[in-house]
Amino acid sequence: MLRRVLASKRASLILMGMLSFYIIVSASAPAYAMHIMEGYLPAGWAAFWWLVALPFMLLGVRSLTRITKANPELKLLLALAGAFTFVLSALKLPSVTGSCSHPTGTGLGSVLFGPLAMSVLGSLVLLFQALLLAHGGLTTLGANAFSMAIAGPFAAYWIYHLTIKLTGKQRIAIFLAATLADLLTYIITSVQLALAFPAPVGGFIASFAKFAGIFAITQIPLAISEGLLTVLVWNWLQSYSPQELQLLKLIQGESQSHESI
């Protein structure tokens, strides 16, 4: 009986992922560019962000290997975290020239598996989007990965554990982790664009204020919506995948995640 229930849950999750992938790939509108588009950054800055992001990606591979070897049954949940990020970050609204606003979807995976594992999942999502959907690019993958797959997940991880420590309210912690990680992603993107293209008058500060101000118009409501959606997904996981959450020590009053920093 238990095997049949587990098989049914796995089948429904796989079907959900396949349907989401099909809808995004086959029915997506023409792209306006995902994050920073291919060729937009000067070569020096593109190389710089690649060098900054690579160590996190390598550490993330080691973290993922450790997680899957220790608990192979978590592979399906890892795939779900990646699919959640892929679907949410593919929902785009045009914003500043050379970029766009969208949810990031990295908060859930960061809470479940830690920021290092999420750095790999997020980078793979960005790679697939660049190759399959023409969102973002390969030269700018380092910059996009640093903002969405590294800075955002680390923020989500720390915010979640700090909120749990201060309030003990898990759903509030998850909402804040997802929302603020989304906002930080776009603060970092604004910094990256301002560094590459300082304003003739006012330099970096003026350029950052321009990029961040325009992003905020669409990103603040998107971030709040992402936080609410992440809480709904968390409730679903508690109902249908309690064994995995217990294995990760994320329910029954324990706030430690599978990966420690």
From Swiss-Prot:
GO cellular component: ATP-binding cassette (ABC) transporter complex
UniProtKB keywords: Cell inner membrane, Cell membrane, Cobalamin biosynthesis, Cobalt, Cobalt transport, Ion transport, Membrane, Signal, Transmembrane, Transmembrane helix, Transport
Pfam families referenced in this protein's UniProt entry, alphabetically: CbiM
Bilayer disposition of the protein: Multi-pass membrane protein
Location of this chain's protein in the cell: Cell inner membrane
GO biological process, one term: cobalamin biosynthetic process
Metabolic or biological pathway: Cofactor biosynthesis; adenosylcobalamin biosynthesis
TM spans (from-to): 41-61, 76-96, 108-128, 140-160, 172-192, 197-217, 220-240
Residues making up the signal peptide according to the UniProt record: 1-33
NCBIfam families per record: cbiM (TIGR00123), PRK08319.1 (NF006184)
Homology family: Belongs to the CbiM family.
Function: Part of the energy-coupling factor (ECF) transporter complex CbiMNOQ involved in cobalt import.
HAMAP family: CbiM
PANTHER family: COBALT TRANSPORT PROTEIN CBIM, PTHR43627
Protein name per UniProt: Cobalt transport protein CbiM
